[in-house]
Every structure is written in structure tokens, then in C-alpha cells.
């Protein structure tokens, strides 16, 4: 598979190593686990090479022997979350199977509140992510859609679910300000269609109402992309 000229190789295509002549004190998996703990407790901004090294009881310079950059660390963290899926066998109802998978995606995004934004801004494919794609395609094995449509469906399932997760995390005060501005803007009379849509609405639908529509929205998107089986 061709790569971008000059781009650094994926961390999983680089040999796991420690300092030359020294036994490995930690594994990438151990370092990743510590980084996940920091992110889950304090947020992604708290994750730095220095902070993770401190949690391990060493200096940042020592950590660079195992993980070259913070971006590598973020990639390891993202892929590690894909190991949390519990793949269920195909039932013969591809759409129901994908909705079940989507609900697992939601649960993982809720557990790791930093993950949805990172998944959208910095998508990464590692060993666990590759296994997840294989499972997704297995659920669609009997579906006649071509592989391009199936990969688009995989991307949309993840992207829409990430957007739902971010919406659930949104500040209610910001939503209230947005609705207040809409009410102000509609008094101009220049948005008749929006006015008709929102007439009688006391407030914008709360995030939990949108969350309740998750399965229906995902079903419509996936059916639109893939078509009937």
C-alpha cells in the first residue's frame, strides 16, 4: 500500500525497542495503559511525555526510548481503545448487527470522554483497529454492496457516533445561548422556513432526546449508503 512521501512509518511498523544495550523496562502496552489513565482522569491535554514518564517514575528522556513522539503515544492510546470491543457473531440481520456495534462505539466514547474528538481529528488504524474493520466487514459479508461502500459505512458509523458523543458532552449553557440567538434572529422575518420549523418550540431538543434517536439515525444512514441486502 503506497504511503505519503516523507511520512513517518506507523509506530506499529517500527520495532519495539529500548535503549541500545539495555533491557526493556516497560512495554508499549504498559506505557499506553498509564497514558490512558491520565487521559481518562484529567483529559487529553494532561497527556504529555513528561507526565506519563513521571507516572512511571522516570524522566521523559527515558520514555523516548520506547515511544518517539506524543503523536505516537496518542496513536497507541486510540488503538488500545479498539481492543475494548466485544465482537458478537453475525445474526443474519446486518443492520441490527451494525447498530449493536455502534452502541459499543458509543459506550467506549462515553468511557473515554477524550476519544471522540481525537478520533475525528486524528483517525488512526493500528492492530486493534484493523481487527475491528475485519469484524465490521464480517457482519456485512453477505451484503451485496461493494467494498468502497462498506468502508464508507464504517467511516460514517464511527464519525456519526463520535458526533453524538461530543453532543452529549456539550455544555447545556451553550445550547441555551444558541437557542436564545435563534429566537432573536427569527424576529427579523428573513428566515421563514426556519421560523415555521421552530414555531412553538420552547427550546431546542435536549441532548438526551437526540441520543434517543441514535439507532434510528444510524439505521437510515447505513441503509442509504449500503442499500438493501
Identify the function of each model-found stretch.
Residues 1-26, 192-204:
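N-terminal intrinsically disordered/low-complexity leader segments
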Residues 30, 34, 38-71, 76:
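Helix-turn-helix
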Residues 76, 80, 156-159, 163, ...:
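Short, residue-level hotspots on alpha-helical faces of the histone-fold
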Residues 86-128, 157:
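Hydrophobic alpha-helical connector segments
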